[in-house]
Amino acid sequence: LPPVYTDMTVLEYLKFVAELKKIPKDQRKKQILEVMNLVKITDMQNRLIKNLSKGYRQRVGLAQAVLGYPPIIILDEPTVGLDPKQIIEIRDLIKSLGKKHTVILSSHILSEVRYDYCKGTACCERHPGKLK
């Protein structure tokens, strides 16, 4: 989910999200730096979100999702509208997230659904009419 508040800088936005998620104050700075490093947006932290490319906005959305280290991360159409290079980068990020989190991915793009995110882990594919 790309960020909604595009008039904030990346850092301001992640601080806001950390507060909403009730991350303890003494852990916020550390966690924000860790997720920015993870999704490779540290060099964008002082830029307004509205001035970022679609790929970087997606990364900010991933950082937001990872903040607080939830056990499950749900991603809806994480590569829609990205160029081929950005798709590869986001896929790699999702694979790395899958090492520490359960990632639920939703996409109507067949190539995205068929992409092998699941090497060495459990993976499930279901069509909408067959979800239970």
Give short role names for the model-derived ranges.
Residues 48-52:
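Conserved ABC ATPase signature
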Residues 87-99:
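Helical segment within the ABC ATPase nucleotide-binding domain
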